[in-house]
Amino acid sequence: INIYCDRFRFFSPRYQATIPGKGKEIVGDVTFNCSRWDCSFHFKHEDKPEDDKTGEKLQSVSRVKQEYRLQLTYSICERLKSRTRTSYTHYVKKERQEGGYLFYQDLMYSSLQTSLKAQFRFAYFDTDSYNTRIYAYENNVLYGYSFPALYDRGIRSYLNLNWKPFTLITLY
């Protein structure tokens, strides 16, 4: 179990908040391991001031964003793993409320005899706007990095193959 809490105050202007303000952030993680199962739950609550430009007067309003994530990993056998993740985001600013979710399924295969590795993902996401975007790390080729912001509605999938036929050669 990990818990983090931060209360902060801004005395000078910053991005999307030109008026000084204060806020808080709370993050929690719970992880449970049992034999072939791994289960983790993540929670994040942000309450930050943001500018509201409706009307002639600039004012600061509270922007609350909550994120929930549940991940289950199951070792089917020594070489094959399955990972399921579901995430939900809730956003509130003044009377405006938005939400969004992500669901993905990973299958990961690793062969010891042929030095072959395969990773497959199928993801579905549906959010109301960019405010409720959900970030999901994607496995990539060596030294490649992908951490896209998923928003609106869509399907995303990939298949990575990694084969090492000889000691000094790796094919992706």
Segments predicted by a language model, with ranges:
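Exposed, low-structure sequence patches enriched in small/polar residues
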Residues: 1-172
